[in-house]
Amino acid sequence: MNTRRLNLLSTLLLVVSLISTLSAQRQSMLINDNWNFRFSHEVEQSSGKRVDLPHTWNTTDALSGKIDYKRGIGNYEKRIYIKPEWEGKRLYIRFNGANSVANLFVNGKHIGEHRGGYAAFIFEITDHVNYGKENNILVRVNNAEQLDVMPLVGDFNMYGGIYRDVHLLVTSNICISPIDYASSGVSLVQQSVSEERASLSAEIQLLNGSLKEKRMTLKMKIQDGERVVREDILDFTLSAEDKSQENIVFSIKNPRLWNGIADPFMYRAIVELYDNNKLIDTIEQPLGLRYYTTDAQNGFFLNGKHLQLKGVCRHQDRAERGNALLLDHHKEDMDIMLDMGVNAIRLAHYPQAKEMYDLTDKHGIVTWAEIPFIGPGGYKDKGFVDLETFKQNGKLQLIELIKQNFNHPSICFWGLFNELKEEGDNPIAYVKELNELAHTLDPTRPTVAASNQSGALNFLTDLIAWNRYDGWYGGMPHNLGEFLDATHKRNPELKIGVSEYGAGASIYHQQDTLAKTVPTSWWHPENWQTHYHIESWKAISERPFVWGSFVWNMFDFAAAHRTEGDRPGINDKGLVTFDRKVKKDSFYFYKANWNKEDKFIHLANKRNTQLTRAKQTFTVFTNTEGAELIVNGKSAGKKDVDKFATAVWKDIELQKGENVIKVVSTDDNRLMDKVALYR
């Protein structure tokens, strides 16, 4: 046989071997396209319309502020061809999110139910499909209120639908488990981390469909890009039981740490499962090594260094899409937050998409992740009922949150509740159970809660934070600092944060004077929001015992029951509009204070173009040293910014008619902002 034939034969054998290896490993196929959607009352054979996922049926009613938006049952149906060669493997359907109760049927047979609208869930369909044929998949989703499903209340829309991706998953008969509460099946437990050494344990969940004892091998590689930093091999006997766990204990010397936005470095943890030297399954997870503490007097420390957590809260909906977001939408949100200089985020009030946690990992954003255990706040309703089914559902949602997101290095806090009340059914005993469960599932992360009142609830979690709206729902902005000082003095051992603070603003509501408005009114002037945030940030930043603060909210979001601001159905406390197109003046105040890299200058109140008074005050936000104000071509003086990146000119007299206002950075005259105003 000549050399050419030998080379060809070798190539063919390599291809066959590669195909065989790949076919033995798991396959994950996105099945978002071509679903038939109909409401439960639409029962005719011709009923329904074609939709692609992610999808919500509330983009028209809820987003237009209709209080009675559709909360009921929607049916999603699709036919899927199941390949004959998949027989003998294990098949699953994985849903990344469907709100809020979902029931899966395959070929008319009920497979299972998931109760909870924000975590991923998965069902095995191996024994219920016809191989080599098309199979009917039906998902019934119900977003009606359920007394045993969190949340019972919320100042946001409860959109219905399959609003995140759906995958068909095919694995070997023996595999790394995808059904451990829809987690990856691999938990990387950071037992201790320092600059000198990181000690870890990889807890790996396994499924044995053969139900026979087998000798197997696990190989785990820790890689820096493609460079292998550490490799461990574990030979073991897989028990005859369907489910089992194996642990690999390992350490890394002189690790490179995940260090927030300064250096969000992550290793790649690759776990491979072998059967008789044949690779049959692979899972890859991020590994960001870090250590952190929170001190009641001095705040938050990441890798031994103090880090002031400058955070925002984020809801997962937007104009036209509702909660049915694509990856580009999550990326756009992250880009806007990074532009402002955010280094922390509270993903409120529920588990959000994996894509968002991936982005917070990638960009070094310290993250507060939470379950939707939400109290009524200022509304008439109940957030907790002392029903065993409700309490079990809350525990399920906490287990899902922690197991599914365990390996995200950005997540530093597990949130247990928001604005609960002790009246009526008292949640204290239950919160204690949740707190204990969180520590059992994850001994490495602290728990946190968001409170809006005094009482025993504030002493149950490792950290506590308050939702404060001084200067919006009551009082004045300076009251925030007074509250923080009084609370810290009264309970110096408490680790205190600010979980929410904010004020509404419409970009269409402008006024010459600075005056507090009525929150429930149709008048939400932008300049009051700006003033509110200037004073609130001063109060927070000057108190080192505040471990973190989170603006409510980064973006305007939909809440159909609200009748205020410039239109119904919107909570306009965002620093950016619901469609992400306009950044309010408050955004630029924070950017000037939090982002010192991207130099800019911003003239506030530019949207107030029709003036009524001759003398005006002009405010500039800039992360440069100072600015010059030029009015109708003449300098009104130069000013250095104060320690809050702000310069103010008062009593500037304007002429009748048009006035051209220009501000220029004294550092770089290429940085400028201007507007034409009329009086």
What spans do the regions from the language model cover?
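Secreted/periplasmic carbohydrate-active enzymes, especially glycoside hydrolases
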Residues: 1-15, 22-349, 359, 363-367, ...
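Active-site/binding-pocket entry motifs
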Residues: 57, 293, 315-318, 470-472, ...
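Long, contiguous interaction/targeting segments characteristic
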Residues: 98-173, 517-590, 595
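Substrate-binding/catalytic cleft of secreted carbohydrate-active enzymes
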Residues: 334-337, 344-582, 586-590, 600-617, ...
